[in-house]
């Protein structure tokens, strides 16, 4: 995923407006406008770096005269104590931009690092790791960028780029067959070319989908490892397969060994810890 420059700029401007408001009175009150300073961002724990260009843009939009020097790139592994970037310029401006820049980098690096951990757990299998739509409001593109930076694959971005027939869709539509037929009719009538994924809750629902057809991918929702193995055998590579629900770091390899094409993990974006990064004055 490539982040649009205009999107990033507007996102950062909103974040700065939220934080700075009418002014950074703490800095304005005690630091002369002529005071210059240097600072460095230090990793206080190992991580996968993510958000470097965004941090650079935060400082640029705060004060175009700040000199930002990146020392690592997104996707690189940082060790505890590594310096990720240096900045030089107005001391007050550096302090004004500090928290917004760190908020982006700490969260995005946390997502990238968590994703990398999960990807490493299923290394050696053919299964690929997907994210979900369980993202922070207005942060989805950034968080999905972080997932990709960590080695994961982006699932659909929103409700508009893929059909996902979940349990509630099926129930409201009057069953699996009705949901599929209505969807196929809608896509044809509106000249839309979208892939269809359908969620099944047990092996009986899976058999109904297999008998009916008309989809591209089948999501095995909250299946046990044993039932996942049976499901993969029943599907026999006729459709893409995805395991979802209840997948953790402890059991993800067991699911991957069942032979599913994808495993989606909501925790990549909604249950992560931000990375501990600290901006320190530099000599």
Which ranges hold each PLM region?
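Acidic/glycine-rich phosphate/pyrophosphate-binding loops and surrounding catalytic core
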Residues: 2-212, 217, 226-234, 239-242, ...
């Amino acid at each position: 995923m490539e982040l649009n420059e205009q999107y990033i700029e507007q996102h950062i401007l909103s974040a700065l407006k939220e934080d700075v408001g009418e002014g950074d009175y703490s800095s304005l009150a005690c630091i002369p406008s002529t005071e210059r300073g240097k600072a460095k961002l230090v990793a206080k724990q190992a991580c996968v770096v993510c958000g470097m260009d965004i941090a650079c843009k935060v400082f640029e939009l705060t004060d175009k005269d700040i000199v930002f020097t990146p020392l690592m790139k997104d996707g690189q592994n940082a060790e505890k104590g590594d310096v990720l970037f240096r900045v030089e310029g107005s001391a007050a401006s550096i302090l004004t931009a500090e928290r917004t820049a760190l908020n982006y980098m700490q969260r995005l690096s946390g997502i990238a690092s968590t994703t990398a951990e999960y990807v490493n757990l299923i290394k050696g299998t053919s299964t690929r790791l997907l994210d979900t739509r369980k993202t922070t409001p207005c942060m989805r593109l950034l968080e999905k960028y972080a997932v990709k930076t960590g080695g994961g694959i982006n699932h659909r971005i929103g409700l508009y780029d893929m059909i996902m027939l979940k349990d509630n869709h099926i129930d409201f539509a009057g069953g699996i067959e009705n949901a599929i037929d209505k969807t196929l009719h809608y896509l044809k009538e509106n000249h839309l070319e979208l892939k269809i994924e359908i969620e099944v809750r047990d092996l009986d629902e899976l058999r109904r989908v297999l008998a009916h057809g008309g989809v591209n991918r089948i999501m095995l929702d909250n299946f046990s490892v044993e039932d996942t193995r049976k499901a993969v055998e029943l599907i026999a590579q006729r459709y893409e397969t995805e395991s979802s629900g209840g997948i953790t770091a402890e059991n993800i390899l067991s699911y991957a060994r069942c032979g599913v094409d994808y495993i989606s993990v909501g925790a990549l974006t909604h249950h992560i810890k931000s990375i501990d990064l600290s901006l320190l004055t530099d000599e």
